[in-house]
């Protein structure tokens, strides 16, 4: 159930499609700190929206999130000035278009390995004549106003994930597709593709070299690059390298880590930050 607070926020917030806020950040050469919504709860989404993230990504691939929950999470994002993105489960036109109709301002798509796959992704995100997106943005129109249709093609962000050897080999082809705005590095699958264990915050010299190469090729094409991180300190290192979006863990892992720390501090002492109960 969507909270009354969420519904009220949708009625009073006035956001236009004149410029995607994430595009505005990047145009100013500022990095975006991205949160990751994997829990199927509008309340947890609302909590995350109030935490100060620049962007929040609804994870429909590995998160416990179906389409109806994704809509609720984007409504939760509307309670604060946070830009909603979505990681779709696959490069499939139907779910991409429905996610955009629900109000996502950017699509992160997994396992884009070739130029043809990047072209298909762009086509699903763009209205004619730049793509094949079907028109029917019911919630997006309500959220962003009458200028949505006119501005969607230039403001919606198209972000293929780079997470295989094949994708790395095809970086120039993928980045040369008109309409691709940025890349997003998936470090766990990227590591698997090179024979390493799946994890975030890669520290293996070979993979660090690959990540640097991805960033360099993106910059060569005038595109931005994001990456999924675990520790905030690692995210800051990525910003220093030139990444312009970094995800910190997931909502579930943030909750788990905070809960563990609170239990440990209570049982063993130390780490008491104080604060309100509610």
Language-model features: locations:
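Expand to "…catalyze enediolate/carbanion chemistry for C-C bond making/breaking, isomerization
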Residues: 6, 12-278
């Amino acid at each position: 159930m969507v909270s009354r607070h969420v519904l009220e926020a949708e009625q009073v917030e006035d956001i236009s499609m004149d410029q995607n806020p994430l595009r505005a950040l990047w145009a100013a050469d500022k990095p975006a700190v991205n949160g990751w919504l994997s829990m199927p709860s509008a309340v947890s989404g609302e909590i995350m929206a109030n935490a100060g993230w620049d962007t929040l990504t609804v994870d429909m691939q590995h998160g416990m999130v179906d389409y109806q929950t994704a809509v609720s999470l984007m409504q939760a994002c509307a309670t604060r000035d946070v830009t909603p993105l979505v990681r779709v489960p696959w490069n499939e036109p139907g779910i991409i278009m429905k996610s955009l109709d629900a109000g996502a301002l950017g699509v992160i798509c997994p396992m884009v390995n070739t130029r043809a796959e990047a072209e298909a992704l762009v086509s699903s995100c763009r209205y004619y004549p730049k793509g094949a997106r079907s028109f029917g943005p019911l919630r997006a129109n309500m959220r962003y106003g009458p200028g949505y249709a006119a501005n969607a093609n230039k403001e919606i962000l198209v972000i293929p994930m780079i997470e295989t050897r094949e994708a790395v080999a095809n970086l120039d082809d993928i980045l040369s597709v008109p309409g691709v705005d940025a890349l997003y590095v998936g470090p766990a699958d990227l590591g698997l593709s090179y024979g390493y264990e799946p994890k975030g915050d890669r520290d293996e010299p070979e993979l660090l070299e690959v990540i640097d190469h991805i960033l360099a090729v993106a910059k060569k094409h005038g595109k931005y690059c994001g990456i999924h991180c675990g520790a905030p300190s690692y995210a800051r290192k990525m910003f220093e390298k030139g990444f312009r979006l970094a995800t910190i863990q997931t909502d579930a892992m943030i909750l788990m880590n905070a809960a563990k720390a609170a239990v440990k501090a209570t049982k063993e002492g130390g780490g008491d930050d104080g604060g309100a109960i509610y």
